[in-house]
Structures are given as structure tokens and as C-alpha cells.
């Protein structure tokens, strides 16, 4: 059974292009990065793409962390100098690397629809990992519900 996410919260999630992903390693050491994502109403997806990475040759820290500890958090936010306009959505959930090619292709399609840059990248299964985050809790704060 999937978590019910209200229409205003779904619109807020869909209206943003970048979120922050928080992972933790097996020892609980946190790691936060900005990331591009797609949301289908029940899950958040992201891909390890061809953008330059700080490190090459081994799985990225976010992937290593998810494999060691699948509990993650995602924050999507609006900042404004007028603090009455502040808003965020905090999603906590379980992350997993997609292992079925059919789901991978569906998620990749969502990402390519949202980000034209992905349409020209050579992204393929299983070389470019796609991660699915299934929300277990969603918290909205501020001007989200408008």
C-alpha cells in the first residue's frame, strides 16, 4: 500500500527540479547531496548520470550508503527573503537500486521527460544505476499547500 500524498504536495514536488538527498553509511555518518529527480506520485527516482563526479572508479558514496542503509530523506524547498513564503517538503523513505529492466526504462523515461539533458546522454541498464525512493512519511511545511 502506498502512502497518500495530497495534490498540493505532489504539485510542489513536481514544480521543483532539484532536491537534496540525505543518506547515511552503515556507521550512521550522514551525507547530503543535491540531485535531479522524477516523481510519479508514489516514488522518487534518480539516476547516476554522466555529469562529472568528484570521484571515479567505484560506486558513488550515495549508492554505497543506500546499499548499507536504505533509509533516506529528501528535502525539496523554497527559500525567500520574505520568510512568510518559506516552504519545504520532507520525504523519508526506503531507497533501492532498481534491478528490473522494465521499471528501469519507465523511471528513465520519467527522468528524460523532465530533464532534456538526459535525452542526449547514453544512459543504460544496468550501467547507470536508477534508485527508487518509496516514501514512508511526507511532511509539508509553509507555503506548500497553496
Protein language model annotation of sequence segments:
Residues 1-18:
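Extreme N-terminal tail/first-helix region
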Residues 9, 58-65, 104-107:
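Amphipathic alpha-helical interface surfaces
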Residues 40-79:
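A short mixed-secondary-structure module that forms the rim of ligand-binding clefts
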Residues 13-25, 71-76:
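A short, Trp-centered hydrophobic/proline-enriched beta-strand micro-motif
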Residues 24-27, 90:
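Short, acidic, Ser/Thr-enriched surface-loop or helix-capping motifs
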Residues 3-4, 57, 83-146:
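Charged, gly/pro-rich active-site loop segments
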Amino acid at each position: 500500500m502506498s502512502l497518500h500524498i495530497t495534490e498540493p504536495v505532489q504539485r510542489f514536488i513536481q514544480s521543483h527540479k532539484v532536491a537534496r538527498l540525505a543518506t547515511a553509511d552503515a556507521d550512521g555518518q550522514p551525507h547530503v547531496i543535491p540531485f535531479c529527480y522524477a516523481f510519479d506520485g508514489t516514488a522518487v527516482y534518480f539516476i547516476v548520470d554522466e555529469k562529472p563526479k568528484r570521484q571515479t572508479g567505484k560506486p558513488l558514496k550515495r549508492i554505497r550508503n543506500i546499499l548499507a542503509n536504505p533509509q533516506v530523506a529528501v528535502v525539496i524547498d523554497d527559500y525567500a527573503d520574505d520568510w512568510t513564503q518559506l516552504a519545504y517538503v520532507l520525504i523519508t523513505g526506503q531507497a533501492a537500486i532498481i534491478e528490473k529492466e522494465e521499471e528501469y526504462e519507465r523511471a528513465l523515461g520519467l527522468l528524460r521527460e523532465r530533464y532534456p539533458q538526459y535525452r542526449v546522454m547514453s544512459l543504460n541498464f544496468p550501467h547507470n544505476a536508477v534508485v527508487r525512493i518509496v516514501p514512508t512519511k511526507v511532511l509539508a511545511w509553509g507555503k506548500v499547500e497553496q
